[in-house]
From Swiss-Prot:
One of the GO biological process terms: DNA recombination
Keyword vocabulary terms for this entry: DNA recombination, DNA-binding, Transcription, Transcription regulation, Translation regulation
Name of the protein in its database record: Integration host factor subunit alpha
Quaternary data: Heterodimer of an alpha and a beta chain.
Entry's family note: Belongs to the bacterial histone-like protein family.
PROSITE patterns in the cross-refs: HISTONE_LIKE
Described function: This protein is one of the two subunits of integration host factor, a specific DNA-binding protein that functions in genetic recombination as well as in transcriptional and translational control.
The keyword DNA-binding is annotated on this UniProt entry: yes
Amino acid sequence: MALTKAEMSEYLFDKLGLSKRDAKELVELFFEEIRRALENGEQVKLSGFGNFDLRDKNQRPGRNPKTGEDIPITARRVVTFRPGQKLKSRVENASPKEN
């Protein structure tokens, strides 16, 4: 099961008493600000949670798994996430949920 933006909005509605519209807008604005910062080449640091960084990957050789043909994998920029120590610790100490 995954946490969705809709569930985050619902949580803000329940816990903070925001209207459903305001809660949804708050979640959208939060993620839009992260997107904007990354698009502008900025690092995003969320204290107690982790860091979003941009990494440039060089072109490298690859292979088509169906045909075995050599094909180049083009250079690209990727987003990486490094969890902070507090998040790592909480995840490591959490009891696993039964599926």
